[in-house]
């Protein structure tokens, strides 16, 4: 898959950090674990060896995945973005029309979404509904839990913390 995808500079740093850790720390550790397990004799009935080999396969798969992701990433520096319209990287404050509760979301890349930190994927229903809107606009969001209506209160572009 060669499709570029948007990611924040901080999100990209996180991917790179994980990739370096897997390559330079975990690879070495798993090689040592495999060598130690080999010393225990017959490999056909060696659970430690099998577990270490499975972990090695997982780590190598994740390394390949991260290498692919970092190669395809389109890094977007949110700190340099501005404007009144909502786009990737926006921190958006909304008011729920039903409850009058205020909620804030940050629109980020697919691989850095984390709802516990109010970071929603650009591919999510809420982000798709918000893209292109501005302060004062009303938006209807359809999710698996049903439909909700919000008013856009603020749109900001500011650097993310890791």
Swiss-Prot record:
Please name the GO terms of the biological process aspect recorded for this protein, alphabetically.
Answer: DNA-templated transcription elongation; regulation of DNA-templated transcription elongation
Q: Name one GO molecular function term.
A: DNA binding
Q: Which domain of life is it from?
A: Bacteria
List S-S links within the chain.
none
The record's listing under InterPro entries reads: GreA/GreB_C_sf, TF_GreA/GreB_CS, Tscrpt_elong_fac_GreA, Tscrpt_elong_fac_GreA/B, Tscrpt_elong_fac_GreA/B_C, Tscrpt_elong_fac_GreA/B_fam, Tscrpt_elong_fac_GreA/B_N, Tscrpt_elong_fac_GreA/B_N_sf
Xref: SUPFAM superfamilies: FKBP-like, GreA transcript cleavage protein, N-terminal domain
UniProt feature coiled coil, ranges: 45-74
Sorted UniProt keywords? Coiled coil, DNA-binding, Transcription, Transcription regulation
What role does this protein play? Necessary for efficient RNA polymerase transcription elongation past template-encoded arresting sites. The arresting sites in DNA have the property of trapping a certain fraction of elongating RNA polymerases that pass through, resulting in locked ternary complexes. Cleavage of the nascent transcript by cleavage factors such as GreA or GreB allows the resumption of elongation from the new 3'terminus. GreA releases sequences of 2 to 3 nucleotides.
Instruction: Family membership, please give it.
Output: Belongs to the GreA/GreB family.
Q: What is this protein called?
A: Transcription elongation factor GreA
Tell me the gene name. Answer: greA
């Amino acid at each position: 898959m060669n499709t570029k995808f948007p990611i924040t500079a901080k999100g990209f740093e996180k991917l790179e950090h994980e990739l370096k850790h897997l390559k330079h720390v975990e690879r070495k550790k798993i090689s040592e674990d495999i060598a130690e397990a080999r010393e225990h004799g017959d490999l056909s009935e060696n659970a430690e060896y099998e577990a270490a080999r499975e972990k090695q396969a997982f780590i190598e798969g994740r390394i390949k995945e991260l290498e692919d992701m970092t190669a395809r990433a389109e890094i977007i520096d949110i700190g340099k973005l501005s404007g009144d319209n909502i786009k990737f990287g926006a921190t958006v404050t909304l008011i729920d029309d039903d409850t009058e509760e205020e909620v804030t979301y940050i629109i980020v890349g697919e691989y850095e979404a984390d709802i516990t930190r109010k970071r929603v994927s650009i591919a999510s229903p809420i982000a798709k509904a918000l893209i292109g809107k501005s302060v004062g606009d009303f938006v209807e969001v359809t999710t698996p839990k049903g439909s909700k209506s919000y008013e856009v209160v603020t749109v900001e572009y500011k650097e993310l913390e890791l």
